[in-house]
C-alpha cells in the first residue's frame, strides 16, 4: 500500500492517471488501428464492379469503415477486392498484383463468378479465386448489392480485430495467427432466413 499527501477533498493522483491514460495490449492497439484504416485496391473484371463502384458513393458512406481511399497501386494497399469473372489469362496478373501488396494483406471475393466461377463452367474461367489466392471474406450474389460489400467489410474488420501477430523483431518474418471459424456465414444466417413468413416483391419495400 502506498500513501500520498494531499489536500482534503482534492483529486487523488490515481484518479488523474486513470482519466488521462489508456491501458491495453500492443496487439489489440495494432489490430484496432488496422481494422479502421483499410486501404482497398479494386480489381474489377465485369458486372460486379458496377455494384462495387456504387458502394463508393456518398449514399453508402464507405468512409465509416476507414476504407474510402481507393489505392491506384498495390504497393499502397492492404485489401484486394476481386469482383467479376476471373479468366485464366487474368489469374497470373492478379496473383502478381497480390504479391506486390505489403503484409498484412486481405482478400475479399465479391460475386458468384469470383467465388466459384458462377455460370461460366468452362475451361477459360477460374472456378473460384480461392484456387490461387487466400480469400478472407466471400460476398455472394449475382451481382451482390452494395450493402453486401458493406457487411463484408464489417466481417473483415471483426476478423482483423482477433488476429494475433507475433513480434517479428524477436521471431523473424512470420505470418498472422488467424482464428479458425468453422461456421460458414450461410449457415449462421439460416435460422433468420427460415423464419421469414411473408415474401414480397423487393421493389415494393
Curated annotation (Swiss-Prot):
The keyword Electron transport does not apply. Keywords: 4Fe-4S, Cell inner membrane, Cell membrane, Iron, Iron-sulfur, Membrane, Metal-binding, NAD, Quinone, Translocase, Transport, Ubiquinone. GO terms for biological process: aerobic respiration; electron transport coupled proton transport. PROSITE patterns: COMPLEX1_20K. It catalyses: a quinone + NADH + 5 H(+)(in) = a quinol + NAD(+) + 4 H(+)(out). Its cofactor is [4Fe-4S] cluster. Binds 1 [4Fe-4S] cluster. It is an enzyme of class 7 (translocase). It is a peripheral membrane protein. It is found in: Cell inner membrane. Its EC number is 7.1.1.-. InterPro entries: NADH_UbQ_OxRdtase-like_20kDa, NADH_UQ_OxRdtase_20Kd_su. GO terms for molecular function: 4 iron, 4 sulfur cluster binding; iron ion binding; NADH dehydrogenase (ubiquinone) activity; NADH:ubiquinone reductase (non-electrogenic) activity; quinone binding. Residues 171-205 are annotated as: Disordered. One of its GO terms (cellular component) is respiratory chain complex I. The keyword Lipoprotein does not apply. Residues 183-193 have a biased composition (Basic and acidic residues). PANTHER family: NADH DEHYDROGENASE (PTHR11995), NADH DEHYDROGENASE [UBIQUINONE] IRON-SULFUR PROTEIN 7, MITOCHONDRIAL (PTHR11995:SF14). NDH-1 is composed of 14 different subunits. Subunits NuoB, C, D, E, F, and G constitute the peripheral sector of the complex. NCBIfam families: nuoB_fam, PRK06411.1. This is NADH-quinone oxidoreductase subunit B 1. It comes from Cereibacter sphaeroides (strain ATCC 17025 / ATH 2.4.3). The lineage of its organism: Bacteria, Pseudomonadati, Pseudomonadota, Alphaproteobacteria, Rhodobacterales. The gene is nuoB1.
Amino acid at each position: 500500500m502506498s500513501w500520498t499527501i494531499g489536500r482534503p477533498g482534492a483529486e487523488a493522483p490515481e484518479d488523474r492517471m486513470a482519466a488521462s491514460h489508456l491501458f491495453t495490449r500492443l496487439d489489440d492497439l495494432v489490430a484496432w488501428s488496422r481494422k479502421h484504416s483499410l486501404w482497398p485496391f479494386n480489381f474489377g473484371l465485369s458486372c460486379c464492379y458496377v455494384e462495387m463502384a456504387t458502394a463508393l458513393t456518398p449514399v453508402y458512406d464507405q468512409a465509416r469503415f476507414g476504407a474510402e481511399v481507393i489505392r491506384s497501386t498495390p504497393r499502397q494497399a492492404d485489401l484486394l477486392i476481386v469482383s467479376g469473372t476471373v479468366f485464366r489469362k487474368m489469374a497470373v496478373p492478379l496473383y502478381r498484383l497480390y504479391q506486390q501488396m505489403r503484409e498484412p494483406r486481405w482478400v475479399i471475393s465479391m460475386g458468384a463468378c469470383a467465388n466459384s466461377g458462377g455460370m461460366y463452367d468452362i475451361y477459360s474461367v477460374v472456378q473460384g479465386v480461392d484456387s490461387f489466392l487466400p480469400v478472407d471474406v466471400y460476398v455472394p450474389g449475382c451481382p451482390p448489392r452494395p450493402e453486401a460489400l458493406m457487411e463484408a467489410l464489417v466481417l473483415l474488420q471483426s476478423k482483423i480485430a482477433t488476429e494475433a501477430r507475433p513480434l517479428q523483431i524477436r521471431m523473424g518474418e512470420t505470418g498472422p495467427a488467424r482464428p479458425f471459424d468453422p461456421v460458414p456465414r450461410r449457415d449462421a444466417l439460416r435460422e433468420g432466413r427460415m423464419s421469414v413468413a411473408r415474401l414480397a416483391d423487393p421493389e415494393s419495400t
